[in-house]
């Protein structure tokens, strides 16, 4: 498996996890979390989105 295939797989896994996090954020379970946990999950989402964008840019330049 070459590096592009690994990046494609990594992005697919990341995007799947990101989709699940976004879905969780629209539930009552998320809104009932302590404020600090909500803050950290929101930051996690932002970083995951940035990471996904970086992987997409790497693939676009390949």
Name these PLM-found stretches.
Residues 1-62:
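Extended, charge-rich alpha-helical interface modules
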């Amino acid at each position: 498996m070459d590096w592009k295939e690994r990046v494609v797989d990594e992005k697919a896994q990341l995007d799947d996890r990101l989709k699940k996090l976004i879905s969780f954020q629209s539930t009552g379970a998320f809104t009932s979390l302590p404020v600090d946990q909500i803050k950290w999950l929101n930051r996690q989402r932002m970083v995951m989105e940035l990471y996904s964008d970086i992987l997409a840019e790497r693939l676009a330049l390949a």
